[in-house]
Amino acid sequence: FFMKMNSRSLLAKRNAFGLLKSVSLTTTLTVSFSVIAYAQSSSNPNLQIEATGSQESNTSILTPTKILQGNELLDKLGTTLGATIGIELGVSQTGYGLGASRPVMRGLDGPRVQILQNGLSVGDVSAISADHAVASPVANARQIEILRGAAALKYGSGSSGGLVNVVNDRILTNLPESATGAVNTSYDTVSNGRAASGVIEASVGSVAVHVDTAINNNQNYRIPGNSIQDGPNQTWNIPGEPFTEATNYTGKLPNSFNNQNNLGVGASYIGKSSYTGVSVERMNNNYGIPTVEGGMIAQSQNRYDFQHQTRDPFAGFSSIKFSAANSNYNHTEFAINPDTGYTPAALWKNISNEFRLDLAHKQFMGWKGSFGAQVTRSSLEATEIATGNYAILPSTKTNSNALFWIEEGRWGALQGNLGLRYNAVSQNPNQVTEFQNPGAEPQPNPATPNLENRNFNLLSYSAGGLWNFSNGYGTGLSYTVSQRAPSAAELYSYGIHESTATFSVGNSNLNKETSHNLEFNIQKTVGKVRGKVNAYLNKFNNYIYGFYTGQTAEAAEEFSVVVAQQAAATIKGAEAELTYNWNQFGSGARLFADASQGTFDAGGNLPLQPAPRVGLQLAHQQNKWLANASYTYSFEQNRLASWEVG
C-alpha cells in the first residue's frame, strides 16, 4: 500500500545488457489527495497542448502517443521518469528501486528506448545498465511526451520501443505578462519521502527569465515481508554490518533510499518573430542499489542548452530552429565494505555535445512537416578508482550524423504520416586497453572483443494512415522500420558488473539491429466515454541480447558470464484503455490493460520481458480539490528465457 499526498499553490496558469531478472506477481495500490489554488479561474481546466514531435494535436497523432501535462502530470509525478510514466499503456519500468527506474516500453528498454530533454539527448549512461538513473529531473517538467513511429524518427533511429521527451520551460518562447510562480510539495508514506519543487518566471523588457529547483529525499522503503525471495545470490548487505550468507531483512528494503536535487536557470530574448535563449542545469542524485550485493551511486550532471527559432523566416516555411546542448555527466559507484561501509569502486564520465537544425514548412497539398540535420559527439569513460584501469568497458567515442524528414497530412476523414531518417554512426574505442582475466569456470575464457572502430549506416522509415470513419471514431495502421547501431557496451564490454552480478562480455562483430513494426489501432476520442485498443507485431533481424553462458568468473566473485549475441526475434502485444470523464471536473475512471510476448524465432523466450497487467484509476475533482486512487495488478511472468530465474 502506497499513499501520496500533494499540496500545490499555482500562482498563475502555466501553458542491458546482461541483467538477470527475477519476476513475480505484483499488486500496487496508490492513493493521493491534492489541493489546488489558482490565482485566476479558467472555464476550461484542460490546457491545449501540442506534442513537439508532431505537427498535429494530441488526438490526431496516428501512432499510440501519450502526453502527460498539467494536473495529470503532477498527480503521477514520481521520483524518477520510469515511476512517473510507469502506468501508461505499454510502459513499465526497470526494477532497481526508487533511484534508477527507467522506462521499459513494449518489452524493450536500454538503447531501444531513447530519452530526450527538450528534444535533445539527456547525455547520461542510463541506456547501458538498469542501475544507472536517467539524468533528466521530472519535478518541474511542463509535459512528458511518449512518441512512436514517424514522430520518433525526428529524434533518433534506434527507438524501436519508443521515445520519451521531457519538456521544461527553462528557455521561454514568450514574455510572461507578469511575474508568476508555482510550488509543489508531496509526502510518500512508503519511504517517508519528502519532495518539494518550485518555479519562478518573470520578464525585464524583452528578456524572459526562468528559475526552477527541486529536492526529493526518500528513505529505505517499507516492504510487507522479507527481503529474500527464491533464487541465487541471496546475501543482502548493508554498510556497517558484516557479510552474511543469508541475512533476511524484514520491514524495509536495504539500499532503496534516494536523495536528489536540481537547479535550473534560463533566459531568453524575445523578438517580434524570434527568440534566442540559454539555460543551465545542475543535477545531483544519490541512490541505493537494492540488490543482494548492495551499493549506491552518486550521480551529477551539468547541462547547458541553447535555442534559437525564427518564425516565418521565408516564403513557404513556418519556422527555422537551431538547438544545441552540452552535458557533462558523471557518477561514482560505491560497493559495500563490511568494515568501512560504502567504498568508491568505479567512476563513470560521459561528455556529450548535440546540435540540431529543424526547418518546418507550411501546408502544401495537404502535407505539413519538417526536415533537418542532427550531429552528436559523445565521449564515454569508466574507470576503476582503486587501480585506474578501465571498468567494464574501454573509453569510447561515439559520433552520429543524421538527416531526417517527417510529414503529416489531412484530407477530410483521412490522415497520413511519413517519416525518413538516415544515420551514420561510428564507435571508436581506446585501442590500447588491456583486458582483465575473468578466470572463467569452466575454461576457456570468453573471447575478448576486437578493439577496432566500427561504422554503421542506418536507414529508418515509417508510414501510417488514420481513417476517422465517424465523428470521434478512428482506426489506424502504421508500419515502421527502425535500425540501430550496437552500443559501445554491447560491442566492447569485458568486465565485472556488480549490480547485475555478471561478468559482461561484448561482441565487436555485432551487426546493426533492424526492427519491422506493424501496428493497428482503433480509438474513440470524444464524449465522456473514450477508449483505444492497440495491437502490434515487431519482428527483429539481429536482435541483440545478453546470453548467459553457464560459466562463472572467479575474478568476479563467481558472477555469471554474459556474452552479447544476436538472433531473429519477435515481440507481439496488445494494449487497451477505457476512460469515463477522465481528467475532467466531477468523478472519473480509467481502466487499462497491456501485455507483450517476446520470443526467439528459433525457439525460446526473450529475456527481460514485462508481465501482463491490468489497472484501475479513480478520481474526483471538485472546486480546488482532487482525490484519486490507482490499483495495478501484474500477473506472474512465466514466459522466461532459459537462463532467467522466476
Language model feature labels by segment:
Residues A39-L74, G82, G110:
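Short, acidic, small-residue-rich periplasmic hinge/interaction motif at the N-terminus
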Residues G82-D124:
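Extracytoplasmic beta-strand/coil segments of soluble accessory domains associated
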Residues S121-A150:
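Short acidic/polar hinge/loop motifs at secondary-structure boundaries
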Residues A139-Q143, L153-W236, N258-N261:
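Outer-membrane beta-barrel translocator/receptor signature
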Residues S191-N217, Q229-N286, S300-D312, Q363-W367, ...:
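Transmembrane beta-barrel wall of Gram-negative outer-membrane proteins
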Residues S256-Q260, S273-I320, N326-S352, E384, ...:
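Flexible loop and strand-edge segments within Gram-negative outer membrane beta-barrel domains
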Residues G294-P313, W348, T396-T398, P446-N468, ...:
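Outer-membrane beta-barrel signature, preferentially recognizing the C-terminal barrel domain
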Residues G369, A413-L414, V425, K528-F540, ...:
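Gram-negative outer-membrane beta-barrel transporters
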